[in-house]
Amino acid sequence: MVAGHFTYGARWATRQERRIAQNPHWVFAASWWQRDARHSVRLSDQFADGDLADFEPIGLREAPRIDVRRASLRGRAPKPPVRRPPNIILIVLESVAARWTSLSGGGYNTTPTLRAEASRGIVFDNFYAHIGRSSNSLSAMLLSAYPKLGFRDMTAEYPDLPGTSIASVLRERGYHTGFITPSALTWAGWDRFLDRRGFDDVRDERQLACGERISSWGVEDRCMVDDMVRWMEADAARPFFLMTWTQQTHHPYEPSPGIPLLPLARDRVIDDFGFDRYLNVLHETDHQIGRVFDAVRRAGRERDTLVVVTGDHGQAFGYPHESFMQGRTIYEEDVRVPLMIWFPRAYRVPMRSAVVGSHVDLAPTIVDLAGVPPAPEWQGRSLFDTRRSPRAYFYVAEDEFMLGVREDGWKYILNVRDGTEELFDLRTDETEQKNLARLHPDICARLRRRLAAWTEANRRQYLQARPAGAAHLMLRAPGA
């Protein structure tokens, strides 16, 4: 108990009390705003009409298509395949930041399977979640639509949000579609949100028949993979799209029974808010994902299958910033997520890309590789689109309300409450330690206008979809 007080309590729980003591009025207002769920943030900065182009529907701007094998890493879209449309497997890793995987340069041996399979694919090093909240990531990935700039879960606030899902697009092309997770889809209204989204089959822990829960979040990821393999083998006549979502890497990071813990935390304190447990669970999930690749090869579908692995958001463990869990900041450990695309048909040698992208770009990228046109209302762009924006947008709406944008190597963060600005050059400062805002006011002003355009585009986007009787609240940063 004493150890728990000094490791868990002192490092995290008391930190929440300190926030409340330092900002009581803001915390009270934020809690009211979160409970009300009807307001949207806006900035009053002036911006050019052209700044809204980042958020326009994809139907207003078509991209050329060329062979991906001759494309530069800056990204161009492949032409549609002439053979059977590829099977598509999308695996979303719960609470996994790029930093903690073996795909990044962090040195953690957590995902040896993904590292090995990347030899027949491409890894995107600068891919982002829009917020550290799973429900909002689901909405963005599935519908290629920016989530509302607010506090609430998109699945609960907008269960019937208009939009065309990637599953619907592919089902119209003859794909058999499915969604499988070892969690309970009743959480935050996911079951209702996924209803009528183009999935032939939707399965959660209740259909997996895998015994007792391993934690309050659901059964083991192993159970999901068992069901994935059965599902993929059930209908070989049609191409399929299977979206899956793991759960064991969610707090409390419960390891599978009988799996010994490995010393994966390196020089970090073993009981560093569950960091070592987290890394071990990620290692076990990676092992289970290896069974998916084995099943694809066993079925002889290696050249006819596209596997996409990404994360829903990051997870923080107190380094390099004083932040824990997720959704509290928009530093790299919170919002930069892995993205590996395994496609032996196109990639015979490992490739890496520095293209900046985000969750809204995932669906357009997948259908692009499959040779299928995107839904015209999608806001994202294929990561192989030569005319795509070099920017990614993200926000946090918990203890603070912060907006952020990554543009090439620059990352800009604005605290809407107090006007604090942070500017980092990620090309030389990967851990965001040197705030260059005072040295580059011109860059800050330009990127702040980009954020102002985002808030306006987001307001227009959700104007008709807002809950009945909604009003919006303008937050003006000091000096705005």
Give the location of each predicted region.
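Catalytic-site neighborhoods of secreted/periplasmic enzymes
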Residues: 136-217, 247-260, 266
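Long, internal low-complexity/basic segments
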Residues: 438-480
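His/Cys-centered metal/cofactor-coordination and adjacent catalytic loops
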Residues: 72-79, 83-86, 97-176
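C-terminal cap/loop subdomain of S1 sulfatases and analogous C-terminal strand-loop tails that border
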Residues: 316-317, 361, 367-426
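Histidine-centered active-site microenvironments of extracellular/periplasmic hydrolases
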Residues: 301-347
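Active-site His/acidic residue clusters
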Residues: 207-210, 228-281, 316-326
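N-terminal secretory/membrane-targeting segments
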Residues: 1-86, 118, 459-466, 474-480
